[in-house]
């Protein structure tokens, strides 16, 4: 991997879905200290908004493993479900055999397990209110919605971060 961009200093994720369940998309970006931005996203035919939120975060965590990053990096998201699940609920779910407090099977267990596997020390999730003018949140929302609707969108992408639609 090239180090030409320096450390990752910021990241953002979002998910979108039409119908819930229905066609969905996710969008993400990472910012490097040299000012460059890497954007990526994906599409699923039959999914939910929550699955797309989790997928976006998972894809960012996978990318973060390959780069130097700010030791206090925060992944910004407008999904309280993602934040609460990743930061708090997952500990109890694992202790209870992936059951909720009411005894039901945890939804999206496959993605929660993958997120836990790719968890990185000192990387936390940070809430940003959706559609509040935050530029990174607005951009990843645009990416997620475009992918969910199969609308072409130009992504900022360097050669070492691959994007396929």
Swiss-Prot record:
One of its GO terms (cellular component) is cytoplasm. One of its GO terms (biological process) is DNA replication, removal of RNA primer. It comes from the Bacteria. GO terms for molecular function: magnesium ion binding; nucleic acid binding; RNA-DNA hybrid ribonuclease activity. Its cofactor is Mg(2+). Mg(2+) 1 binds at residues 14, 53, 78. Residues 5-149 form the RNase H type-1 domain. It is found in: Cytoplasm. Keywords: Cytoplasm, Endonuclease, Hydrolase, Magnesium, Metal-binding, Nuclease. It catalyses: Endonucleolytic cleavage to 5'-phosphomonoester. Mg(2+) 2 binds at residues 14, 141. Its main location: cytoplasm. Its EC number is 3.1.26.4. It is an enzyme of class 3 (hydrolase). Binds 1 Mg(2+) ion per subunit. May bind a second metal ion at a regulatory site, or after substrate binding. Pfam families: RNase_H. PANTHER family: RIBONUCLEASE H1 (PTHR10642:SF26). Belongs to the RNase H family. Monomer. Endonuclease that specifically degrades the RNA of RNA-DNA hybrids. This is Ribonuclease H. It comes from Prochlorococcus marinus (strain SARG / CCMP1375 / SS120). The lineage of its organism: Bacteria, Bacillati, Cyanobacteriota, Cyanophyceae, Synechococcales.
């Amino acid at each position: 991997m090239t180090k030409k961009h320096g450390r990752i200093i910021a990241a953002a994720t979002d998910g979108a879905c039409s119908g819930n369940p229905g066609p969905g998309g996710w969008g993400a970006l990472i910012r490097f200290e040299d000012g460059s931005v890497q954007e990526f996203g994906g599409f699923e035919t039959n999914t939910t908004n929550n699955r797309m939120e989790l997928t976006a975060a998972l894809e960012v965590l996978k990318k973060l493993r390959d780069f130097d990053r700010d030791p206090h990096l925060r992944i910004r998201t407008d999904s309280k479900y993602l934040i609460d699940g990743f930061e708090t609920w997952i500990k109890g779910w694992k202790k209870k055999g992936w059951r909720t407090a009411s005894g039901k099977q945890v939804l999206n267990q496959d993605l929660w397990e993958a997120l836990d596997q790719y968890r990185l020390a000192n990387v936390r999730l940070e809430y940003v209110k959706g559609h509040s003018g935050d530029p990174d949140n607005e951009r990843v929302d645009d990416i997620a919605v475009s992918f969910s609707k199969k609308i072409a969108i130009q992504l900022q992408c360097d050669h070492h971060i691959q994007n396929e639609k």
